Amino acid sequence: MKKIVVLSVFVLLTSFAAMAQKYAFVDSDYIRKNIPAFNAAQEQLDKLSKQWEKEVSDGYAVVEQMYKSYQNESVLLSQDMKTKREEAIVTKEKEIKDLQNKYFGVEGELFKKREELVKPIQDEILKAIKEIAVEGSYAVIFDTAAGGNILFANPKYDLSDQVLQKLGYKN
């Protein structure tokens, strides 16, 4: 009997503790869109990306032209010349693939530039969210932009504007 009473009290206390926890959410996309430095960084990244995409695309166009030229002239070329042209095409294609990887690979220039420009802003946002969570005694703050399965969120629990204010941006 004592065990049942102790267990009941434990369940009752833990249910009260669970009910006392506060939850809120932010929309990190909304926050970032309202920070001019983030928008400027994103524009710079987009500009670089387009520039690099054009460079890679132009390189592949050169390879394509080399291949078409080779196909048209192959009947006139000696075996030695065919081999040299094939090697030149393969070498050029490898150069372009390496260039593409250099710009857009996992540790590529675009990734590094994004780390340089965007990460400090994201770190500031995260710091502000953590400060608000501590000040407001929130147990959990969700991000609705992260693609989680939040089917409904009451706007009164949205702390996005509070985060922007903490970062010094009026909205």
Label every model-predicted segment.
Residues 1-4:
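Positively charged n-region of N-terminal signal peptides that target proteins for export
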Residues 7-15:
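Bacterial N-terminal signal peptides
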Residues 16-20:
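Sec/Tat signal peptide C-region and signal peptidase I cleavage site
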Residues 21-136, 140-148, 170:
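Amphipathic alpha-helical segments
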Residues 151-153:
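Short, exposed beta-strand-loop hairpins at the edges of beta-sheets
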